[in-house]
Swiss-Prot record:
GO molecular function, one term: protein homodimerization activity
Organism of provenance: Citrifermentans bemidjiense (strain ATCC BAA-1014 / DSM 16622 / JCM 12645 / Bem) (Geobacter bemidjiensis)
Protein name per its UniProtKB record: Protein GrpE
Ranges where the record places region Disordered: 1-29
Major subcellular location class: cytoplasm
HAMAP family in UniProt: GrpE (MF_01151)
CDD domains membership: GrpE (cd00446)
Ranges of compositional bias, category Basic and acidic residues: 1-23
InterPro entries for the chain: GrpE, GrpE_coiled_coil, GrpE_head
Assigned GO CC terms: cytosol
Subunit field text: Homodimer.
Gene3D superfamilies (UniProt xref): 3.90.20.20, Head domain of nucleotide exchange factor GrpE
Length: 188
């Protein structure tokens, strides 16, 4: 009987040990599990909100980049020819001077006029227009560069007396100012 008692006692110990193991392996209570899941969900919600915010910022940055590239592309198309035009303007000036200093009408002078007209027409197609500077126009430092001053009783002070060199605009932006002489009041 001792053996039975001993075996029974051993069996109880094993049962107690297995119960302990079961207690250790038992899942958390439902309330604890819910709390744990809510915390995990809240953390994932914050992470999701941060990722969404990051996505929106990146998308806005990309859109701004696209707009900037498009604007730069338009600027290049609009003003990219500025360097070439600046090289052509002195030749244009020389053609105008040749016509102004011609002593007589000849086929050569007429050819120069025709060449000048064609060149001006071609430049106009690319957005180049002359700065209007008729005599008597008020001096505007945005479009004119004063090369000198002349005392004049006939003209209002600060008006254009003469144009040395025409100014030009490229798509309404100043390419080269007109070089002019400006009237001042005569000394008393």
């Amino acid at each position: 009987m001792d053996k039975k008692k001993h075996d029974s006692h051993q069996h109880e110990k094993k049962a107690d040990a297995s119960q302990e193991k079961v207690e250790v392996a038992q899942p958390l209570s439902d309330a604890d599990r819910i709390k744990e899941l809510e915390e995990a969900l809240a953390a994932k919600g914050l992470e999701s909100a941060a990722n969404w915010d990051k996505y929106l910022r990146e998308r806005a940055d990309l859109e701004n980049y696209r707009k900037r590239v498009q604007k730069e592309k338009e600027e290049i198309l609009k003003y990219g020819k500025e360097e070439v035009i600046m090289e052509i303007l002195p030749a244009l000036d020389n053609l105008e001077r040749a016509i102004d200093h011609a002593n007589e009408e000849s086929a050569i002078v007429e050819g120069v006029r025709l060449t000048l007209s064609m060149l001006l027409s071609a430049l106009k197609k690319f957005g180049v227009t002359p700065v209007e500077t008729p005599q008597g126009t008020p001096f505007n430092p945005e479009f004119h560069q004063a090369m000198g001053q002349v005392e004049s009783a006939d003209q209002e002070p600060n008006t254009i007396v003469a144009v040395f060199q025409k100014g030009y605009l490229l798509n309404e932006r100043l390419l080269r100012p007109a070089m002019v002489t400006v009237a001042v009041k005569p000394a008393a």
